[in-house]
Regions:
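An acidic/histidine-cluster motif and surrounding catalytic segment
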Residues: 1-106, 116-148
Length: 148
């Protein structure tokens, strides 16, 4: 069973329960469930803006950031990394995009997990592969396609 730590560093927003976050993470891990450790941190806009500037060199807030763990050569570890999700942005995007809050939370948490697993969306073929997998994973939990 994966070790999934959920940290709440934000208040006042409708936030998912730790059990829901763990379920979404486990579902996105697929076959890597047994040996994995990761952290999901829910933050406010100030913390996310600071992280986005510091680690991506981009000003402003974003919805989710993933920080993969990169072990030293020869070191084997189940540590996958950290996912940081900005709760106010998730809530605002869900309303603007006409999605349920749970569906959008599930999507962004699983999106973060896929980044930790090595997926990216910087080039069209990679984006298509990642978005297709996200859609399949969400459908497996009863959520609609987030891209349609």
């Amino acid at each position: 069973m994966p070790s999934i730590e959920v940290q709440y560093a934000v208040a006042g927003e409708p936030l998912p329960l730790p059990g829901d976050i763990r379920r979404w993470v486990s579902h996105a891990l697929q076959d890597r469930r047994d040996d994995v450790e990761l952290v999901v941190r829910l933050v406010d806009e100030a913390e996310m803006t600071a992280l986005n500037q510091r680690y991506r060199g981009k000003s402003g807030v974003t919805n989710v950031l993933s920080f993969p763990y990169e072990p030293l050569p020869g070191i084997s570890s189940g540590l996958l990394g950290d996912i940081v999700v900005c709760a106010p942005v998730v809530a605002e995007e869900a309303v603007r995009q006409g999605k349920s809050l749970d569906a959008h939370w599930a999507h962004l948490v699983m999106h973060g997990v896929l980044h930790l697993r090595g997926y990216d969306h910087h080039h069209d073929p990679d984006a298509y592969r990642m978005e297709t997998l996200e859609t399949e994973l969400l459908a497996g939990l009863g959520f609609a396609d987030p891209y349609n």
